[in-house]
């Protein structure tokens, strides 16, 4: 009898994607983050669905409804903290996944890489809108400041901001539409992730050596299903420890005060995972320039395939590029730190230097390093 997974139309798709998929035999734990991102998305959609059952998207009762979830709903506090910290886990996995892609040259699969950038933008938009929903001080002022950036667009800016707000300030209309978008976007992310996977399976996975692995493939199941399962268990253990012991560590205390349009918090800042981009935005004194730099800080990822000058795909045997990569990682940590600091000396100049270094490494130094390494290897 023919095995059902090879004949049934639906099972056949699952089989080709997760069971009989030929995978390189040498991919390391850095390749675990794709499946972990899938896990994060499932956790966020599941916990978000239960939160949405009790949440009210109204300016008068939004803050109270979140308090009600934490106090009165069975395990509501747990669901709320899983969802809030799940976003942080999502971005940790996301940034590690992107870092892996840069280090090992996975960006040479252009379609997969570009769909990944779209996924990053969608995830950032979803996280931003989710942060507005509890309607605390930082929610309200974060929404006001970030949406206001669109007013820097010449000619249509102001109209665009008022159109997004649904009025002349962030109010009930804004909260309601943000809730609607925050609910629908994760499903769009899930669909886009399927496209991401589709393009990846057209070419097959990259590997740490950055060389074709057609001569040495192994089936995805049981080898990588078990390997992914180990990653899932480790991440879940760390995540639940964090949620149960330090649930408020990454949150802003200001968000425990209800939104008040008449009282501006001394330091308006987004969640930690946006701080690097926020620091780049603030490092330029001009509003429009800052917005352009903010968008480019993410869009610059799309240039990686075009700026790849090295004859080797992976950085595994390219010491200069390796050094620059880790300087870039350190630079991102510095930008994240600066994004959470007030706008005053010496933080201003540190942020500006770190922002210039960020773009310099990606646009100039890495391509030049690739050319130098070609010369060193006489390629």
Swiss-Prot record:
Localization per Swiss-Prot or TrEMBL: Mitochondrion inner membrane
Keyword Transmembrane helix: yes
GO biological process: mitochondrial electron transport, ubiquinol to cytochrome c
GO cellular-component term (any): mitochondrial inner membrane
Transmembrane segments: 33-53, 77-98, 113-133, 178-198, 226-246, 288-308, 320-340, 347-367
Membrane topology: Multi-pass membrane protein
CDD domains xref list: cytochrome_b_C, Cytochrome_b_N
Cofactor: how bound: Binds 2 heme b groups non-covalently.
Residues that bind heme b b562: 83, 182
Keywords from the UniProt entry: Electron transport, Heme, Iron, Membrane, Metal-binding, Mitochondrion, Mitochondrion inner membrane, Respiratory chain, Transmembrane, Transmembrane helix, Transport, Ubiquinone
Residues the entry annotates as binding heme b b566: 97, 196
GO molecular function list: metal ion binding; ubiquinol-cytochrome-c reductase activity
Top-level taxon in the UniProt lineage: Eukaryota
Cofactors (names): heme b
Binding site residues for a ubiquinone: 201
Pfam family, one: Cytochrom_B_C
Annotated family: Belongs to the cytochrome b family.
PANTHER family, per the entry: CYTOCHROME B
Additional observations: Heme 1 (or BL or b562) is low-potential and absorbs at about 562 nm, and heme 2 (or BH or b566) is high-potential and absorbs at about 566 nm.
Summary of subunit composition and partner proteins: The cytochrome bc1 complex contains 11 subunits: 3 respiratory subunits (MT-CYB, CYC1 and UQCRFS1), 2 core proteins (UQCRC1 and UQCRC2) and 6 low-molecular weight proteins (UQCRH/QCR6, UQCRB/QCR7, UQCRQ/QCR8, UQCR10/QCR9, UQCR11/QCR10 and a cleavage product of UQCRFS1). This cytochrome bc1 complex then forms a dimer.
Protein purpose: Component of the ubiquinol-cytochrome c reductase complex (complex III or cytochrome b-c1 complex) that is part of the mitochondrial respiratory chain. The b-c1 complex mediates electron transfer from ubiquinol to cytochrome c. Contributes to the generation of a proton gradient across the mitochondrial membrane that is then used for ATP synthesis.
Protein name: Cytochrome b
Organism: Chaetodipus intermedius (Rock pocket mouse)
Taxonomic classification: Eukaryota, Metazoa, Chordata, Craniata, Vertebrata
């Amino acid at each position: 009898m023919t095995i059902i997974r090879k004949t049934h139309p639906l099972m056949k798709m699952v089989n080709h994607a997760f069971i009989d998929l030929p995978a390189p035999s040498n991919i390391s734990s850095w390749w675990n983050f794709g499946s972990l991102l899938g896990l994060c998305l499932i956790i966020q959609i599941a916990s978000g669905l239960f939160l949405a059952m009790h949440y009210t998207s109204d300016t008068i009762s939004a803050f109270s409804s979140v308090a009600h979830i934490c106090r009165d709903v069975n395990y509501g506090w747990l669901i709320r903290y899983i969802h809030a910290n799940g976003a942080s886990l999502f971005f940790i996995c996301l940034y590690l996944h992107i870092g892996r892609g840069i280090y090992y040259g996975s960006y040479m699969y252009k379609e997969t890489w570009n769909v990944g950038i779209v996924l990053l933008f969608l995830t950032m938009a979803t996280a931003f809108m989710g942060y507005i929903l509890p309607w605390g001080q930082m929610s309200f002022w974060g929404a006001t400041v970030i949406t206001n950036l669109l007013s820097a667009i010449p000619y249509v800016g102001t109209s665009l901001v008022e159109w997004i707000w649904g009025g002349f300030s962030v109010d009930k209309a804004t909260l309601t539409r943000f809730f609607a978008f925050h609910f629908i976007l994760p499903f769009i992310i899930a669909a886009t992730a399927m496209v991401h996977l589709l393009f990846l399976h057209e070419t097959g996975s990259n590997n740490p050596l950055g060389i074709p692995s057609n001569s040495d493939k192994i089936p995805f199941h049981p080898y990588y299903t078990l390997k992914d399962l180990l990653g899932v268990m480790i991440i879940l253990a760390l995540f639940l420890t964090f949620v149960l012991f330090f649930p408020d560590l990454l949150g802003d205390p200001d968000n425990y005060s209800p939104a008040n349009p008449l009282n501006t918090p001394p330091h308006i800042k987004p969640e930690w995972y946006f701080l690097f981009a926020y620091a780049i935005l603030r490092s330029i004194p001009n509003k429009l320039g800052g917005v352009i730099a903010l968008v480019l800080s993410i869009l610059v990822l799309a240039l990686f395939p075009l700026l790849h000058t090295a004859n080797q795909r992976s950085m595994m045997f390219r010491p200069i590029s390796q050094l620059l990569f880790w300087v870039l990682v350190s630079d991102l940590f510095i930008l994240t730190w600066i994004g959470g600091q007030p706008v005053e000396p010496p933080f201003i100049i540190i942020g500006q230097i770190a922002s210039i270094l960020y773009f310099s490494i990606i646009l100039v130094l890495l391509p030049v390093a690739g050319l130098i390494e070609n010369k060193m290897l006489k390629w």
